[in-house]
A protein has these predicted regions:
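Compositionally biased, intrinsically disordered or flexible polar/acidic segments
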Residues: 2-503
């Protein structure tokens, strides 16, 4: 967003005084049509180092790996020397720990699997949490998932208690072998793991051909390698609340709230579907692509053309530079009066490049119209090394002269694609000497009190006009989001870094 968050905040305060909030609280919508639910063939939840069975906080049952066919023999089991009270006991109370390489072997049917690795860095069996540096690989696929990985350094930098890494790997044989190898370059190095999930994945990446963003507005088809591994960096329910794995429509995925990743004060407005609008999946969008709760909520820029033309609705996501990323954007028009083409048309910018001009959700949903989920896949290349800010921005398309100058998004997923050498490796974040900045994960709209009354409304009109005048002088014509005046700070990678902050 150009012009800075202060200017955007003034604009949004003024707009809030003129127009009521668009969120439909407590509305009861018709029962959605989500298609046939996906039932995974393989669904393994392994509580490493534990015996018996236990349920996690989402009600899912995990099996202890003691004596199981998956765990390597004679691998030491350990409990955390002290456990943060915010950390769930399942699967984080126990771990498998070793200073030598070890391999878990899962007999599976062929096909793509979600692989989730759970880590709680603690002192295990008199081993220091800071000494755990290790790699994780899938030898049969020649894929390195993690290298020189430090769960302790990562959680310290992000102020998180535990972390979860999610990958999508393609199994071609009858087994998935997962090898943990301590790093030789670190004294006293060891590897550990608290929990492993292996869940069959629905056909998520072969349904449509992504578009490769070239930067000139002329995207080209991108052929995905069916054998390639991917890492889930972000999975966001835009405009809605977090969705737990038990509420997902396929693969036990977690969907996180998008508010911590919105740039500055330009959060727009979030809302639910109209009571009369049911989410109905078309034939080309299976229900397992995303749950109906994702499509039943949205975030848009708001009702004021002047405000919307002066900023971009922007999310900032931190990723590893030097990789290609598959960005999946979920759309669904869920409120009247957006029922016809060319009512809401907007442009999509990814990593400061034009990915799509003239995006029209109703037109994409033709002939089904309002309440119809659609999604679009884009592949974006990044250069350099280290950790970088990845911008996702939306802006009204003035060239089409739409009825409403606005943009909408319902959900967002970002996947890292493996390099040709099979690497998905990223850097450990560097802990800061200062306390981490507040992520802003609370309800941002609570920062602006309701404004009522004719006098305040009149002041808002004046403020709106003044803000538009000032901001337009400070901003260039609205195109892709440029670099911000200040750094956004290290924000936690959604599924890549876990979900529980330290107390």
């Amino acid at each position: 967003m150009r012009g800075g968050p202060r200017c955007a905040l003034l604009l949004l305060v003024a707009a809030a005084a003129l127009v009521p909030a668009a969120r439909a609280q407590g509305a009861t919508a018709p029962a959605p049509s989500s298609g046939v639910p996906f039932v995974p063939r393989d669904d393994i939840l392994l509580d490493c180092g534990a015996t018996g069975k236990g349920n996690d906080t989402d009600g899912r049952q995990w099996d202890g790996d003691a004596g199981s066919k998956y765990a390597p023999p004679k691998l030491a089991s350990a409990s955390a020397g002290a456990q943060d009270p915010s950390v769930p006991q399942v699967p984080y109370l126990t771990a498998r720990v070793s200073a030598a390489p070890f391999t878990y072997s899962f007999p599976l049917g062929p096909g793509r699997k979600f692989l989730r690795l759970h880590f709680y860095p603690a002192n295990y069996s008199n081993r220091n949490a800071a000494d755990a540096f290790f790699s994780v690989s899938v030898p049969a696929a020649k894929v390195t998932l993690l290298s020189n990985f430090s769960a302790y350094q990562t959680t310290t930098a992000l102020n998180f208690a535990y972390i979860v890494r999610e990958f999508s790997v393609n199994v071609t044989g009858q087994n998935l072998d997962l090898t943990f190898t301590p790093e030789k370059g670190h004294p006293n190095a060891y590897a550990f793991i608290n929990g492993i999930e292996v869940v069959s994945s629905p056909d998520l990446f072969d349904l449509a051909t992504p578009q490769l963003v070239t930067g000139d507005g002329n995207s080209q088809p991108y052929e995905m390698d069916p054998a390639a591994a991917l890492q889930t960096m972000y999975r966001l329910n835009v405009g809605g609340q977090a969705i737990s794995p038990s509420k997902d429509s396929g693969g036990a995925r977690s969907w996180d709230d998008d508010t911590p990743y919105i740039y500055g004060a330009g959060a727009g407005v979030s809302y639910q579907n109209d009571p009369s609008v049911a989410i109905t999946y078309p034939d080309n969008v299976p229900g397992y692509v995303a749950p109906s709760d994702v499509y039943a909520t949205a975030r848009s820029m708001g009702p004021d053309k002047g405000v919307n033309m002066a900023y971009n609705l922007t999310w900032i996501l931190q990723v590893d530079a030097g990789y290609q990323y598959l960005v999946r954007l979920h759309f669904c028009e869920i409120q009247s009066p957006y029922t016809k083409p060319n009512q809401r048309v907007f442009n999509i910018y990814l990593n400061n490049q034009t990915a799509m001009q003239g995006a029209d959700v109703i037109q994409w949903a033709d002939p089904n119209g309002i309440g119809t989920p659609v999604y679009k896949d884009y592949v974006v290349s990044t250069v350099g090394s280290g950790i970088m800010d990845f911008w996702v921005a939306l802006h009204p398309d003035a060239e089409t002269k739409p009825q409403y100058y606005d943009a909408i998004l319902n959900g967002m997923e970002v996947f890292k694609l493996q390099l040709t050498n099979g690497s998905l490796v990223g850097l450990n974040p560097v802990p800061s000497a200062d306390p981490p900045a507040h992520s802003g994960s609370g309800d941002k709209k609570s920062l602006v009190a309701p404004i009522v009354g004719g006098v305040i409304g009149g002041l808002a009109v004046l403020a709106l006009g003044y803000c538009c005048f000032i901001c337009k002088r400070r901003r260039k014509a609205a195109k892709a989001s440029g670099m911000s005046d200040g750094h956004s700070g290290w924000l936690p990678l959604s599924l890549d870094q876990g979900r529980n902050k330290k107390l």
